[in-house]
Amino acid sequence: MLLGGLIDTLTGANKSARLKGTVVLMRKNVLDLNDFGATIIDGIGEFLGKGVTCQLISSTAVDQDNGGRGKVGAEAELEQWVTSLPSLTTGESKFGLTFDWEVEKLGVPGAIVVNNYHSSEFLLKTITLHDVPGRSGNLTFVANSWIYPAANYRYSRVFFANDTYLPSQMPAALKPYRDDELRNLRGDDQQGPYQEHDRIYRYDVYNDLGEGRPILGGNSDHPYPRRGRTERKPNASDPSLESRLSLLEQIYVPRDEKFGHLKTSDFLGYSIKAITQGILPAVRTYVDTTPGEFDSFQDIINLYEGGIKLPKVAALEELRKQFPLQLIKDLLPVGGDSLLKLPVPHIIQENKQAWRTDEEFAREVLAGVNPVMITRLTEFPPKSSLDPSKFGDHTSTITAEHIEKNLEGLTVQQALESNRLYILDHHDRFMPFLIDVNNLPGNFIYATRTLFFLRGDGRLTPLAIELSEPIIQGGLTTAKSKVYTPVPSGSVEGWVWELAKAYVAVNDSGWHQLVSHWLNTHAVMEPFVISTNRHLSVTHPVHKLLSPHYRDTMTINALARQTLINAGGIFEMTVFPGKFALGMSAVVYKDWKFTEQGLPDDLIKRGMAVEDPSSPYKVRLLVSDYPYAADGLAIWHAIEQYVSEYLAIYYPNDGVLQGDTEVQAWWKETREVGHGDLKDAPWWPKMQSVPELAKACTTIIWIGSALHAAVNFGQYPYAGFLPNRPTVSRRRMPEPGTEEYAELERDPERAFIHTITSQIQTIIGVSLLEVLSKHSSDELYLGQRDTPEWTSDPKALEVFKRFSDRLVEIESKVVGMNHDPELKNRNGPAKFPYMLLYPNTSDHKGAAAGLTAKGIPNSISI
C-alpha cells in the first residue's frame, strides 16, 4: 500500500519533487471565549517572522545517525497565513504548503513534524499532500490535535499518515517515532502540576472530591476505576487528598480530550458553573423570600409556562463580571431583567396527568431513563442476599393475597412459570445505607421492592410496592416493612398509592444517577481512554476503532469532579444519598464485571432474555415489547458485526493478536492499573483470541455510545418534571390518625409535593438536567466520523459504510415500531415515543440539536 510505485519513482526523472499540500486548521479566534486576543497577537507575530513550519519524515529512508529514524526533509512554511482571515465564529481555515522533497534520497514520506512559532495554539485538523511520488493519490495526515507554541514541548510534534499498522508492520523508519509518541503520551517521568498543553495520560485515584469524603480507588473498602492524573499539589490539611480548584479554574485534562469546538465545551462548562455559582444563590434568596415550597403541581408547571423572577444577589452580579460577555444573556438571569424559565419536559407535553397513571409508571421501567434495572422474578416471595449475620431475614413481606387478584386468573406459581412476574428490587441496594442516609437533614428514604405483572396485551402493570425501613433489633439491621397495592385515584388511599410509587421513583432516581449513569458509563470508561492513549499508537487499528468513542469523556468527568459529584456539589445537594453517594457507588463497583456490560449478557443475567440460536440476535426477549432492549439488541448486533468485520482485516488468526505488543500492553494495564482494584477477578478476558478482542471492543463501544445515550438523554424529558422522578423523599408515608394523613385528605397535591424533592432542590436539579440532556450542534453520532479520511484502508472504509447503512436501517425500524399500535410500551399514556436509541446516524448537519430525546452519540461527552 505504502510502497507501491516506489521503484518506478526512484528511477527516471523524479529525483526531486515539489510536493504541494493543503493544511486545514482551526485558529484561536477573536470571539474565542477564553482568549480574546489570540488572533491579533498572532498577526503581529507573523510580521516578526514567526509562523508555522512543517517537515516531512521518510517512511523508507533511515538516518543511521539519528537512532534509525526516518530521514527528515527541509522545512516548509504555511502560505497565506496572514491573508486567510478567520471567520466571525471559530471555524476552519485552509492554507497552502510546498515541500522540496528529494525523492532519491528521502523516498516516500510517512510522517510529518509540525512546529508552531505563534504565541497561541491552534487545532490542526488535517494535512493533505497531492500527487506524492511512490503513492497513488493523496497522502493525508489526520491530526485533530491542538498544537501549542513550540516552547511548551520537550519534543517535536509528529503526525503519521492515515495508514494503519500493527506494531510488527510499522515501517522501520517510522517505528522509533511511533515509540517516542507513546512514551511522550505516557509521561511517566513528568512531574506536575500538568498544564493544558501537556499531553500526559496517567492514572490517579478519586482523592480530589473534597474533605470529608473517602478516597475512591486504591483500597479494599472503596475500590474504584481510576481517573486521569492532574498532579495538583496536595490538600494543605490532608496530604492524602489532592487540592481543589476554584470553580472557574480549569481541571487538567490532555488538551486533545477537550471538545473540538471551543464554544461547545465552554458553553457546557459555563452552564454548569452558572447554576452552581450564580443561579443557586439567587434561588436560595428566592426561596427565603417566598413561602419556599411548591404547593401544587401547577406551581411546578409554572416553571415551564411562566418562569420565576430571581432577585438580585451579589453572587449573580459577580458572576456577570467573570463570564464572557456573549454568554451572560443565555445563562444568567439577572434581577428582574429576565426570568428563570425552563422548557416543558416531554413527559407532560401531550398530557399533564399521564405520568400519574400506573401504566406510565410501569412503562418507564421498560422505556424510561433507567430501563436497565427490571428483572424477572424467579421465586416468591422475593428473597434477600444481605448477610443474615448482620441483617437478619429480609425476605419480602409481599404475599400471594396481595397480588393474585390482579394476575388475570393465574396463581402466583403459574405466573412465575409463564414468565409473567417481574421486579424492580432496590431493597438490598439501599438497606445497608439507610440508617446513615436517613440521618441526613431533610431525608427519609425507604428501601423498595416493586412487583409487576406482564399482561396479556404486552403491557406491565404494578402489583404491589413494599416499603422497608431499617430497624436495629438484637444487634441486627432488620426491616420494618409495609406493602401497598394499587388503588384508583380520587381517594386518600389512592394518594397513598401515588406516594408509594414516588418512594420507588426516589430509589430508582438515586440508583440511576449514581450507578446506571455515573459509575457504569462515565467512571468505568475513563481507564480505557487513558490506557488506549498510553499504549495504542494512532496508527494502530484498534486505536482507530475505539478513539471516536472516547471523545470528550475525560473532560466531562473532570467537570463532574469539580462541580457535580464533589463534596457539597449539585449531586449531593439534589439526590438523596447525599454525602454517602460516591461511597455507595464504590461498594457497587466491587461486583462490577466487564463481561456483563454487553447488552445480551445483561439481559440474560436479569432474566429478561434467554439464549436462542434461532433468534436474529441469538437471544429472545421474554417481554417482547421492551423498547430499550428491542432497539438496543439491534444496535448491539450492528456494532458487533462492524467490530468483527473490521478486526478481521488486521487479525487473520489468534497468533497475530497474541504477538501484538501494543494490544497486550493496553489490556494488561487496563486490567492491572485502570481497573486495578479488580485485577484479580477471574472474569477478565485473557486477550488471547480475536473473538475476545472483538467482544471487548464491542462492549467498550456499547458503553460509550448506546448505553450512555439510553441513561442520559432522557433525563430532562422524563425527570425534568420532578413529581415523575423525585430525587429525595423527606418524610414517612402518612399513617391514618396523623396530621400528615389529614393533610393528604385535605390537600393531597400539597402533601405529595412536601414529601418529595424540595423547591430549591427541584429548581437546581432540573436546571442541571436540562443542560445534561442536550445534544450539541456538532454532535457526532454512532456511524459518523469527524474526518472522512480517518483511514487510508479501503476495506476499513467499506466496513464502516456498511455499519452506517445498518444504523440508518435501524432508524426506520424504530420509527416503524413507534407507529405500531400493537406495541403499547413504545409511547404510553404520555404519548412520548421511545427514541433514546434511535441512532440519528442520518443527521449529518446537526439538525437534531438541543433537547431532542433521541440520538446515540459516539461517546460520553455530556
UniProtKB/Swiss-Prot annotation:
Record-given protein name: Linoleate 9S-lipoxygenase 1
Binding site for Fe cation: 517, 522, 708, 712, 862
EC number assigned by the record: 1.13.11.58
Anything else known: With linoleate as substrate, lipoxygenase 1 shows a specificity for carbon 9 as the site for hydroperoxidation (in contrast to lipoxygenase 2, which shows a preference for carbon 13).
Keywords: Dioxygenase, Fatty acid biosynthesis, Fatty acid metabolism, Iron, Lipid biosynthesis, Lipid metabolism, Metal-binding, Oxidoreductase, Oxylipin biosynthesis
An annotated Gene Ontology molecular function: metal ion binding
Pathway recorded for this protein: Lipid metabolism; oxylipin biosynthesis
Co-factor requirement: Fe cation
BP GO terms, sorted: fatty acid biosynthetic process; lipid oxidation; oxylipin biosynthetic process
Protein family per UniProt: Belongs to the lipoxygenase family.
Assembly behavior: Monomer.
UniProt organism field: Hordeum vulgare (Barley)
Cofactor binding note: Binds 1 Fe cation per subunit. Iron is tightly bound.
Keyword Nucleus: no
InterPro entries, A to Z: LipOase, LipOase_C, LipOase_C_sf, LipOase_CS, LipOase_Fe_BS, LipOase_plant, Lipoxy_PLAT/LH2, Lipoxygenase_dom_3
Residue ranges of domain PLAT in the record: 34-161
Catalytic activity line of the entry: (9Z,12Z)-octadecadienoate + O2 = (9S)-hydroperoxy-(10E,12Z)-octadecadienoate
Top-level taxon: Eukaryota
Region Disordered, residue ranges: 212-241
